[in-house]
């Protein structure tokens, strides 16, 4: 049974944060719709040429189509699954530095994320000393998002934060996790 679009986009009234997980290439009308009321937008980027290219198009669409103003500082980037001291990491960081958009976290390519997914838990639920480095980066993301919440905004648009109380996960139909 297929749900109607309005049902899929329905947000419970008690929701304080809304996470939209979308592909990098989203139709322009949909992009405008999902970013219209966004208080913050996070773009995760992997250290690969393919992902860098997709992210550059996504960010261009956010700036030019959705009219997100980078001076508002509500748009940020997260480097995802990185390995420092590699050429791909250097290439990714050069690309991200060239954007003029804040890089708020650099998530490492860690087995902690694999284990957490296998166990169906978030890394914050794992043994603290084992995930210390990963949690330091996640805390940067959470702090950045909290900055927007304390300013009175109601929605968060991201694809990297785990589900927590008062957060509703929304995925476009047919789209898997990033």
Which sequence ranges carry the predicted segments?
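Residue-level detector of alpha-helix boundaries and kinks
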Residues: 19, 43, 126-130
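C-terminal lobe/tail of nucleotide-utilizing enzymes
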Residues: 74-178
């Amino acid at each position: 049974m297929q749900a109607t679009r309005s049902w899929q986009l329905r947000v419970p009234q008690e929701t304080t944060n809304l996470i939209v997980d979308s592909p990098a290439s989203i139709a322009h009308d949909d992009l405008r719709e999902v970013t219209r009321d966004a208080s913050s937008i996070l773009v995760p980027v992997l250290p690969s040429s393919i992902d860098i290219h997709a992210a550059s198009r996504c960010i261009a669409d956010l700036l030019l189509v959705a009219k997100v103003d980078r001076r508002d500082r509500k748009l940020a980037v997260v480097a995802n699954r990185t390995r420092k001291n590699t050429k791909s990491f250097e290439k990714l960081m050069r690309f991200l530095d060239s954007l003029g958009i804040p890089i708020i976290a650099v998530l490492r390519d860690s087995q902690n994320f694999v284990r957490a997914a296998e166990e169906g838990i978030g890394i914050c639920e794992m043994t603290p000393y084992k995930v210390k480095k990963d949690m330091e980066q996640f805390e940067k993301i959470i702090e950045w998002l909290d900055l927007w919440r304390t300013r009175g905004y109601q929605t968060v648009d991201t694809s990297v934060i785990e589900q927590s109380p008062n957060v509703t996960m929304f995925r476009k139909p047919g789209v898997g996790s990033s």
